Every structure is written in structure tokens, then in C-alpha cells.
């Protein structure tokens, strides 16, 4: 790394510390969260249990999932512990996490801090959710509309709560797209024989744009959307496609980069066209790529294999109590299963979100 590169890294580090210190001071002074609520939409990266009670094989409500969570029990999170959005909620000053909207806990005062509508195996492409009987983004939006109708009454019964403020001042997080490629496009001849990855990306971007506009029409003004991760660095992808230079699949990573470029361009267009919209693109690609290709620099011992089972492919029902070879210490691993980061990796990703998302709360 050159001298200028070192200074750039130092600048980023100190900048991050200053932002974090500012947020801590704000939380302490207010003695309450920096925003009234968090609303989460997307796929398995942010699902906290909506798939638990629907008819789908894509679940994570059994061991060893959740073994390192605060309750040491599976919740439906595709992780050994906390998700990046859980850490984000903590960083913003919340003492609890937004509940899965389909869970029994999603009622009364619990809904005053927002809700999680995400569903594993969902995506921007409706066919992805349909393939796995997951909750599509349009369906998630319908659940959000139901939330809006419920929160008015709940807020009225709590004198310190204002329903309109919850909606307009809350932060909305959208994380989707990975399942569209990994769990659909790359394995579906009806798609990859008919469309190039670039053409498929265009379809996803159209869906993304429509979703953001619909959220905006319902009152959302502070929205953060994540980029695709380095798809070619996911252990399951490496197992199926094979590694290339740097240990990751260059082809899959290039597909992710192409999509992310379109996501950034479209997001800028949306900000220009929708008055008052604060839309931030969270770069997940680079920080996770750094973890996957230089794990030792971040305190990890393994990034090619996941913790669960053999670490080559297992996820969801294939990552279960009978999976042979599951690691004892997930903090040494970047990935928990074939597709999802460990809690330790999620903490690092959340710290990156903290810096890039400061404009959403200021």
C-alpha cells in the first residue's frame, strides 16, 4: 500500500471514530433513539423471522442458527448471532430490535419502533420469491400498508407517540438482489439462457426504482439501500462456480459490480425526481470483499469456508444440528453459512453503514 493509501485509510478510520463519537453523544443527551423507528425490507440478509411461520423451506429457526444470539436460541436470523441491522438499531440507540411483522410479538408498543418485513429468498424479481414461496417485495409493501393502518391507533393510545412522525422520520432499509442472482438467475436456465446478467440487472433495477417510489408515496423519506455483496466470494458460490484470482469468482463479482453501478445511478435519479427524498446507497461490496480476501487483517482466520458444516455449501435446512464439521468459534470466520456473514463480520459491516448513513439521521 502506498503512502497516500495509508493516509486515506487513516482518514477513514478517524472519520469513522468522529462520526461514532457524535452519535454516542447524541444518544446520551437525548436518552432516546436518534430516529423514531426502523423499517426493514428485503431478503435473508435482514430477515429476522418472517419466514418462520410461512410455507417455505428457506428457514433458519433451528440450531445451530442463533447459537450466539443474545438469547442463544434460533430466531429465524440467517446467522449465528446478530445481523448488521441489529447492530444498526443498537448504534441508533434502540434497546430492542424491530420485530418480524408476521411474528406474534409484532403488536402494541413493539410496533412503535418500526417493523421488519424482510423474507429470506425474496428479491427485486418477483419470480425469485415465488420460486421459494417467500414474501415478495410487493407483498412486503402490502404488509407495510397494514402496519400504517395499525400504527395510527397504537400511537393514539400512547400519548408520546406521533404516527406521522414515525412514518416520515423513520429510517427505511432495503436489502435485496443477492437471492435474485444466487438462488435464481445462475441456476435457472429459463433465465440465464434468455437474458444476459446485464439484462437481468436492468429488470431488477426497474423493480428497485418502483419499490422506492412506492415507499416514497406512502410517506418514507429516509431510505438506505444496500448494494450487492461480492457474490463471487460467497463460499457456496465458490463451491459451485469455482474460485479465480484472489480466491473469488471474478465473473460473479463483475455481475455484482455492474448491478451496483446501475443501483447508484438510479438512486441519484430518484433523489433528483422525488422532492425531499434522502436516499443513501450503502456499499456492502467493498467491506465484505476486503473481509473475504484479507481476513487476517480484520482478525479472522477463515474466509473461504463457512462455519456451519463443511463450510462449502450449507445454508438453511442444510445447516442443521446434524451438520458435520460446524466450527466451535464463529468469531474466527467471515461467513456463518454458505451465503451469510457471521455476527463478527456483521459488526464490521454495520460500522461501515454507520459512517455512510450519517446523513439519514442528521
UniProtKB/Swiss-Prot annotation:
Sugar attachment sites: 159, 162, 264, 329
Annotated active site: 44, 337, 340
Segments crossing the lipid bilayer: none
Pfam families per UniProt: Lipase_GDSL
Location within or outside the cell: Secreted
EC number(s) given by UniProt: 3.1.1.-
One of the GO biological process terms: lipid catabolic process
Signal sequence region: 1-28
Alphabetized UniProt keyword annotations: Glycoprotein, Hydrolase, Lipid degradation, Lipid metabolism, Secreted, Signal
UniProt KW Ribonucleoprotein keyword: no
UniProt superkingdom: Eukaryota
GO CC entries: extracellular region
Gene Ontology molecular function: any one: hydrolase activity, acting on ester bonds
Family per similarity comment: Belongs to the 'GDSL' lipolytic enzyme family.
Name of the featured protein: GDSL esterase/lipase At5g22810
